[in-house]
UniProtKB/Swiss-Prot annotation:
Domain Cupin type-2: 88-156
Gene3D superfamilies, alphabetized: Jelly Rolls (2.60.120.10)
Organism: Didymella fabae (Leaf and pod spot disease fungus)
PANTHER family (UniProt xref): CUPIN TYPE-2 DOMAIN-CONTAINING PROTEIN, SLR2101 PROTEIN
Presence of keyword RNA-binding: no
Protein name: Ascochitine biosynthesis cluster protein 2
Pfam families in the cross-refs: Cupin_2 (PF07883)
Biological or metabolic pathway of the protein: Mycotoxin biosynthesis
Function: Part of the gene cluster that mediates the biosynthesis of the selective antifungal agent ascochitine, an o-quinone methide that plays a possible protective role against other microbial competitors in nature and is considered to be important for pathogenicity of legume-associated Didymella species. The pathway probably begins with the synthesis of a keto-aldehyde intermediate by the ascochitine non-reducing polyketide synthase pksAC from successive condensations of 4 malonyl-CoA units, presumably with a simple acetyl-CoA starter unit.
Family in the record: Belongs to the oryJ family.
Top-level taxon of origin: Eukaryota
Keywords for the protein's UniProt record, in alphabetical order: Virulence
């Protein structure tokens, strides 16, 4: 594969995050429309990450927009300790990840295209639009198997309690992806 410049949308339409709230009269209203809080290009420019919402605690405090303010000021790393991250990820044709392990719980929903999920135990599944997977700490890699079409996925990432497998603590093992998740404030 030849080296390409980083690209972010791969021919997919721009995403829009619509935020609702309750006005002073108690009516539901749309308060804003944007593309989320943070955006990053990963995987040698073949994967785009859009952080749509993150919270440092559950249940959420939505009084006076505290949740929206926190989300906009705190860029998540891989996930949010004791919280939740809501993320859209787009994959260019043949774009994907290397092997890695994330010590977290992820709901993954395929929105458009196909995503191949491989596990270190030797199993592989190709997920189609509408398919979901619950990723619970395995060493894995993902990739878009198409040579022509992009893939869009939606991720909800939750922290987990310390988990032991055969007496060994399950930890993040990000390999080549270690520097791709930057935590911090805007």
């Amino acid at each position: 594969m030849s080296a390409q410049k980083p690209i972010t949308h791969f021919g997919l339409r721009d995403i829009t995050r619509y935020t609702t709230t309750v006005d002073s009269n108690g009516n539901g209203v749309f308060s804003r429309a944007d593309q989320g809080d943070f955006e990053a290009t990963m995987g040698d420019g073949r994967v785009a990450r859009f952080d749509l919402f993150q919270a440092g605690q559950v249940p959420l405090n939505i009084n006076d927009g505290a949740d929206i303010k926190w989300s906009g000021e705190n860029q998540p790393g891989l996930h949010v300790p004791n919280g939740v991250a809501f993320r859209m990820m787009d994959f260019a044709p043949e774009g994907g990840s290397d092997w890695h392990r994330a010590a977290l719980f992820a709901f993954v929903i395929i929105v458009e295209g196909e995503l191949e999920l491989s596990l270190d135990g030797g199993e592989t599944k190709v997920l189609l639009p509408g398919d979901t997977t619950l990723v619970r700490g395995p060493s894995h890699k993902v990739r878009n198997p198409s040579t022509a079409k992009p893939c869009r996925t939606l991720w909800v990432l939750l922290d987990i309690t310390p988990t032991h497998i055969n007496g060994k603590l399950l930890k993040h093992e990000m390999g080549h992806h270690t520097g791709e998740y930057q935590e911090g404030s805007k």
